[in-house]
Amino acid sequence: MRIWPAFALALAASVASPAGAHKPSFSNGQYGGPDRAYPVQNIDHSIVVYHEITCDDRQLWLRFSAPEAGKGLFVQLGVPKIDRLERYRPTLAVVAPGLPPPQRQFPFAIPVGMGVEVLSAEISRAFHEPFTGTDSWIVVERTLTLPSSGSGYIVAWDPDARPGKLWVAVGEKETFGAADLFRFFGWRASAQAFHEVGAAPTGGPTASCA
């Protein structure tokens, strides 16, 4: 089919765009703790996990491994650009060995032998993702230097315990391959559904979970 080469070129152009494209995954609540965290295979490789915060699934956990001390960890926390989420400000934390011990209470237990670095929402930058045709607000964007090698976690949650939607991105090096061409339409449809692209506005800000 003639459309296939054109599609391949369009996808390649999207991946190579300055805005970049993260390889997506979608959470249905299965990544809610350290024992069932989403596995980040390589912290340099660009991935994103989309997650809906509910009263039953209040956290998103990702597990990573730092190959050496001093390794940089690039992370982003975003919120879909949906009217009811305009003031939604979740929080991100990196939990890993060598980080400072916790100085406050968290809605989850810090694994033994690990410290924590909290990355609170301090910005609200509009972001258009051409790969999926979606729009978001980026509320956290940091490169954190990991003081020790070994396993660690990235945790996202809403400090006010309100339902909402968020995504967490890790890494900056795109690693799309030929096989990903076959997944593109499914990824795009799922991302647009998550961002409620084309959907009618629904309600106002949600109340905190009891």
Predicted regions and their residues:
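Bacterial N-terminal signal peptides
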Residues: 6-14
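Extended low-complexity, serine/threonine- and proline-enriched intrinsically disordered segments
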Residues: 86-115
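Non-catalytic, beta-strand-enriched accessory regions in extracellular/secretory proteins
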Residues: 40-66, 72, 78-81, 91-92, ...
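A mature extracytoplasmic/lumenal domain signature
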Residues: 68, 77-81, 158-160, 172
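C-terminal edge strands of extracellular/lumenal beta-sandwich accessory domains
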Residues: 22-34, 62, 90-100, 134-210
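N-terminal signal peptide c-region/cleavage motif recognized by signal peptidases
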Residues: 16-18
